[in-house]
Curated annotation (Swiss-Prot):
Residue span(s) of the pro-peptide: 24-61
Cysteine pairs bridged by disulfides in the record: 83-90
Protein known as: Allatostatin C
Transport as UniProt keyword: no
GO CC list: extracellular region
Organism of provenance: Camponotus floridanus (Florida carpenter ant)
Function: Inhibits juvenile hormone biosynthesis.
Location(s) in or outside the cell: Secreted
Signal peptide per UniProt: 1-23
Keyword Lipid metabolism in record: no
Recorded coiled-coil stretches: none
Keywords noted in UniProt: Cleavage on pair of basic residues, Disulfide bond, Secreted, Signal
Length: 93
């Protein structure tokens, strides 16, 4: 009987992981959208053009990386879980 429960629990975990991973491609769509709308300056070989293109690309990469940073969201979620469990620890006496 416990093996049936274990199999059911494993199937449930796999289903949740599959659903969670299916929700992730929005970042890839945003990435493609940003890269398709990039208006880099035509490269004429000058240092100024190369610098502008570099800085613009660096800004885009920074935005994409900031979207992937979930540590901040997890920290906030943990804080609010603590507040829901023990309001005194968050808001004082």
């Amino acid at each position: 009987m416990s093996s049936v429960r274990n199999i059911a629990a494993l199937a449930l975990v796999l289903l949740v992981l599959a659903e969670w991973s299916a929700a992730m491609p929005t970042t890839d769509k945003d990435k493609e959208r940003l890269l398709n709308t990039v208006d880099l300056i035509d490269d004429d070989g000058s240092i100024e053009t190369a610098l502008i293109n570099y800085l613009f690309t660096k800004q885009i990469v920074k935005r994409l990386r900031s979207q992937l940073d979930i540590g901040d969201l997890q920290r906030k979620r943990s804080y609010w879980k603590q507040c829901a469990f023990n309001a005194v620890s968050c808001f004082g006496k």
